[in-house]
């Protein structure tokens, strides 16, 4: 239903944000940016 799709969108948005944070963090640690 509607709640499920909203939940799914929130989860995938959260995953995307986490992946971006991890990319930035590893980039800073490895100094590869």
UniProtKB/Swiss-Prot annotation:
The keyword Disulfide bond applies. Pfam families: Antimicrobial_2 (PF08023). Expressed by the skin dorsal glands. Disulfide bonds join 27-33. One of its GO terms (cellular component) is extracellular region. Keywords: Amphibian defense peptide, Antibiotic, Antimicrobial, Disulfide bond, Fungicide, Secreted. One of its GO terms (biological process) is killing of cells of another organism. It is found in: Secreted. InterPro entries: Antimicrobial_frog_2. The keyword Cell cycle does not apply. Shows antibacterial activity against both Gram-positive and Gram-negative bacteria and against the fungus C.albicans. Has no hemolytic activity. Belongs to the frog skin active peptide (FSAP) family. Brevinin subfamily. This is Nigrocin-1. It comes from Pelophylax nigromaculatus.
């Amino acid at each position: 239903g509607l709640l499920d799709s909203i939940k799914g969108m929130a989860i995938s948005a959260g995953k995307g944000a986490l992946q971006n944070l991890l990319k930035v963090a590893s980039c800073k640690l490895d100094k590869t940016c």
